[in-house]
């Protein structure tokens, strides 16, 4: 668990994005209202970070769709949580924050800005070399896919690997690392969630429906354990090499010895032994390759998304967290107050016997409002729906 503070730091950073100015200036009702909250808690530092690209910061990409054989402009609304470990360098870098290290992991003091993971997501959409299986001349392409869903999922995997390659140039000798759970809504229709590590995303739907949009990556899970062992690693006490309680993460290059990245053929050497193996990044002991799940949004049923780090999921299971949020929605509580209560309740569960409740905590709630539906309209709809589901009216 590492060193802890004797008393928790319960000051919270709450960002409630109602986009009132946007609606007033454009007359267009915003989409995907959201609220993010974080709290340092008992940890010595805050190592969580997040990313929100919505409304004025929506990402637009020029994407070649081989299934219709033409270019399209796609809108990407992106929400992400990064849970750092070994410091906040990696998580802050992924979020597009400023970094302070040179290629050897030393402080350079200049705080150079960077675009973070979103840069590589956009790059991978605009520069992919994939086609459909119906293409009669597929030899010119890296790979062909049966479905657009499969192709887009591969694009997210490419983006994660490219980002990890960039991280190596800054943090090769650092012990920092980070999870990532990224929810990307494409053209306001299709939800893709790419996950690497044990942060998590879930989707709430009407009639108490809960859809898991990511799966935790733990070393003791059989598929992860096989990959770790095949690459010469071991798992003890639920940790890779007895150290890392994750089996997938950004950075953590001590567990990626000899990995060769495909973009610039950058080979990572074992820093202590200077051995090279040419291991694909997907086969490293701790791989950065995410799982990617897709969901077609049904605005008549789907209600909201929750993305959170494991500091939250140590306290709540999926059902408990959705129930907590809906309990407060039915009483008319706004999102910023719900997030505040969520964090306060979480820190109150700190238990030295179980070890839960001592981690940093970060959560994002994303409203899935239909086109033209204001935030107040959504609140009213949710309150009415929940009252009916609970037999209160």
Curated annotation (Swiss-Prot):
Q: What InterPro entries does the record point to?
A: PP2C, PP2C_BS, PPM-type-like_dom_sf, PPM-type_phosphatase-like_dom
EC number in record: 3.1.3.16
Q: Does the keyword Lipoprotein apply?
A: no
EC supergroup of this enzyme:
hydrolase
Disulfide bridge partners, by residue number = none
Q: Fill in the misc note.
A: Present with 149 molecules/cell in log phase SD medium.
Family note = Belongs to the PP2C family.
Name of this protein: Protein phosphatase 2C homolog 4
Species: Saccharomyces cerevisiae (strain ATCC 204508 / S288c)
């Amino acid at each position: 668990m590492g060193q802890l503070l004797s008393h928790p730091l319960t000051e919270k950073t709450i960002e409630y994005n109602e986009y009132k100015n946007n609606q007033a200036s454009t007359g267009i009702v915003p989409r995907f209202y959201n609220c993010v909250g974080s709290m340092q808690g008992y940890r010595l530092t805050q190592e969580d970070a997040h990313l929100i690209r919505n409304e004025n910061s929506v990402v637009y990409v020029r994407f070649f769709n081989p299934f219709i054989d033409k270019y399209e402009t796609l809108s990407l609304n992106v929400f992400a949580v990064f849970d750092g470990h070994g410091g906040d360098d990696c998580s802050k870098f992924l979020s597009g924050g400023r970094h302070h290290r040179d290629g050897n992991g030393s402080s350079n003091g200049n705080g150079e800005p960077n675009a973070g993971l979103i840069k590589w997501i956009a790059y991978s959409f605009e520069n992919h070399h994939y086609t459909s299986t119906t293409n009669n001349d597929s030899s010119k392409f890296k790979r062909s896919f049966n479905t657009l869903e499969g192709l887009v999922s591969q694009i997210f995997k490419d983006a994660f690997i490219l980002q990890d390659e960039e991280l190596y140039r800054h943090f090769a000798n650092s012990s920092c690392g980070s999870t990532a759970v990224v929810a990307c809504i494409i053209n306001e229709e299709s939800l893709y969630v790419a996950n690497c590590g044990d942060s998590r995303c879930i989707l709430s739907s009407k009639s108490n429906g809960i859809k898991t949009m990511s799966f935790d990556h733990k070393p003791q899970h059989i598929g992860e354990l096989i990959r770790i062992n095949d690459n010469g690693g071991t798992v003890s006490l639920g940790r890779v090499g007895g150290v890392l309680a994750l089996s997938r993460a950004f950075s953590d290059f001590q567990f990626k010895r000899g990995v060769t990245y495909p973009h610039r053929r950058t080979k990572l050497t074992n820093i202590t032994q200077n051995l090279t193996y040419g291991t694909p990044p997907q086969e490293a002991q701790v791989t950065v390759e995410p799982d990617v799940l897709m969901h077609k949004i049904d605005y008549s049923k789907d209600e909201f998304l929750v993305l959170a780090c494991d500091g939250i999921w140590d306290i709540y299971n999926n059902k408990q967290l959705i129930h907590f949020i809906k309990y407060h929605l039915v009483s008319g509580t706004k999102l910023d107050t719900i997030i505040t209560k969520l964090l306060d309740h979480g820190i109150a569960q700190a238990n030295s016997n179980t070890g839960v409740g001592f981690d940093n905590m970060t959560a994002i709630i994303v409203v899935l409002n239909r086109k033209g539906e204001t935030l107040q309209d959504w609140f009213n709809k949710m309150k009415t729906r929940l009252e009916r589901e609970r037999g209160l009216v």
